Amino acid sequence: MRLRLSARIAAALAAITAVGLAACSTAAPSAPSASAADTTIPLLTVGLNNTEDGAPQTLDVTKAIGADYITVLGLETLMRFNAQGKVEPDLATSVTEPNPVTYVYHLRHGVRFWDGDPLTATDVAFSLNYDRANGSQVAFAYPSVKSITASGPYTVTVTLTHPDASWPYTPAEINSQIFEKKFYEAHKSTYGQAGTLVMGTGPWKIDSFDPTTGAELSANPHWWGGKVPIQRIKMTSFASATSEALAFRAGEIDLAPDVYTPLSFASTSGAKLLATPSCDIDIFIMHVTTAPWNDVHVRRAVAYALDRSAIMTAHGGYATPLYTLIPPQLMQNIASKSQIGSLLSSLPLYQYNLAKAKQELAESAYPHGFSASILEINDPTSLNEDQVIVAELQKIGIRLQIKAVTAADWTAVESGPASQRVSSETSASCFNPDPSAYYDLLGSANTAVGSWNVADYAPPAVDTLMADGLATSNPAQRFSTYSKLLGNLQTNIPDVGLYLSDATVALSTKFSAPGYSYWTSPFSSTGQPDFYLDLRPAK
């Protein structure tokens, strides 16, 4: 169905309040939710679909960010997100801000690693510095950090190079998991690998890991948060969504936390999916420093030619159209719904319009079309969506060839030298509810090897706006800056927003998941174990 512009804006605004996004808080309960702790689940079997991100070869998230589905259960963070997206203490009990560039985290006493050693500030500082080191796949989360030091046995001081309104979220993200320094130093060359594993403080101890078959975990009897409800977790890797769905139907797995093709998975598995709106995006990225993508009229033609409804159908439903790189709901903390609506009304949103697409292409250096290649991960969902994109663009004379590669090869290219990155349709996750959540896709800093500015879009004006957006916590000033940034992005359109995907999981009817939300979902990139802690046997 084709929607008028005003209807699309209304749909975008309706999504603003769907994901519970909220400002930071430093007061919190003493422990993560463990409402299922009065009941015991002997074994939970979990499926992992490796077709989208590829099977992680290590549990070291600096080398394999996709390992977070496993490590989130064992490696904790200083802070955490609650179900409403507010930041609360976790391994830290509180945080103080003596000045705009200094954050002092006061650690929880009595926390021990699985080997019995106490958690200290030295472990925390070492972990965070390791995560932010050059070449780390999660280093993008630390652009404003000057230093992280153990300023006392139980205090960690983070000093920023400049004020950063997004920093308070970072210690709650999967990009900031804490592990034991002593264990790492004893196993530097093999840390995270199958024979070595990792050493954490979390509710489940990782007992075994195999990149091909999966992982096994057991309840940590000494967890500081109390009794752990699930005694054992067995994670099994699957080579396809179909094989995972069939295993669910056969009762071989209880939980599929990573349902990428919701409609087909539900049909094959027989599962009634749990779904909640998210701020995870799917976008078509154009590498703006190579022809023909360096022609803005080509990029605008592509934006007009893509039929989001058809692409969402290929995805498998459970999605909402997206027209900007920054999802509108991420600005809820800095602007009112009416302000966001007025901003969207002022921007070119590139609603599906083949006539305008052809007009833009006629104004380009390629009025009769062109041939080009795009890079894609070789999994059914992505390829189905790409086939729709190919068919849509062919209508205006753009002939695309899909080059399908493994997830590892895709990552090597798209986070490799910026000049060699390739246009691609891909998905991305928001690690926090700040409008800067997708900065890793923009700016000169993220053209470095290991970073994710696939479009290689880094004009000085964008760098300046990105910096200005973080330099103050004043909502009005931030909204003004992000309005200008969105204006730049919508005018130059390096990335075409396609849709926001719901966070969908399949859960056996043997269990219930009260309070299911994006911020505590096992599908989420925020890195919380709460979904597992809150699981209950069905009544």
Outline where the language-model segments fall.
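Surface-exposed binding/hinge segments that line
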Residues: T96-P98, T102-V104, F140-E185, S208
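N-terminal lobe/hinge region of extracytoplasmic solute-binding protein
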Residues: G47-P98, N129, M199-G200
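Ligand-site clamp/hinge motif
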Residues: N220-A266, R399
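Long beta-strand-rich cores associated with HINT superfamily self-processing modules
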Residues: V505-K539
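Extracytoplasmic/peripheral linker and loop segments enriched in polar/acidic and small residues
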Residues: T96, Y350, Q401-D409, Y439-T509, ...
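Periplasmic-binding protein-like
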Residues: T170, T289, W293-I334, N384-E385, ...
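Structural transition elements
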Residues: A319-E360, T381-N384
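Gly/Pro-rich hinge or "lid" segments in bacterial periplasmic/extracellular proteins
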Residues: E173-K227, R232
